[in-house]
Amino acid sequence: MAKEEQIELEGVIVDTLPNTMFRVKLDNGHVITAHISGKMRKFYIRILTGDRVKVEMSPYDLTKGRITFRMK
């Protein structure tokens, strides 16, 4: 899948789940399950409840996503 086809949204971490999964409430009100991208995992970027994050989603499954950036 090409990078241009990804949907990029912002949201807030609502809940922490096992295996570096998170429940994210998007700015449009939807709640999705998201995991950390490989680079964030490699560099040990910590994500806590309440952090603002940038999430990439596939247009085929709008209930799952990948966290690509943690806002300061």
From Swiss-Prot:
Record has Nucleotide-binding as a keyword: no
Record carries keyword Acetylation: no
Protein name: Translation initiation factor IF-1
Pfam families in the record: eIF-1a
Annotated CDD domains: S1_IF1
Family listed: Belongs to the IF-1 family.
Keywords: Cytoplasm, Initiation factor, Protein biosynthesis, RNA-binding, rRNA-binding
Subunit structure: Component of the 30S ribosomal translation pre-initiation complex which assembles on the 30S ribosome in the order IF-2 and IF-3, IF-1 and N-formylmethionyl-tRNA(fMet); mRNA recruitment can occur at any time during PIC assembly.
GO molecular function per UniProt: ribosome binding; rRNA binding; translation initiation factor activity
Gene that specifies this protein: infA
Location of this chain's protein in the cell: Cytoplasm
Organism: Alcanivorax borkumensis (strain ATCC 700651 / DSM 11573 / NCIMB 13689 / SK2)
Function of the molecule: One of the essential components for the initiation of protein synthesis. Stabilizes the binding of IF-2 and IF-3 on the 30S subunit to which N-formylmethionyl-tRNA(fMet) subsequently binds. Helps modulate mRNA selection, yielding the 30S pre-initiation complex (PIC). Upon addition of the 50S ribosomal subunit IF-1, IF-2 and IF-3 are released leaving the mature 70S translation initiation complex.
GO cellular component, one term: cytosol
Domain of life assignment: Bacteria
InterPro entries in the record: NA-bd_OB-fold, RNA-binding_domain_S1_IF1, S1_domain, TIF_IF1
Domain S1-like: 1-72
SMART domains: S1
Position of the signal peptide: none
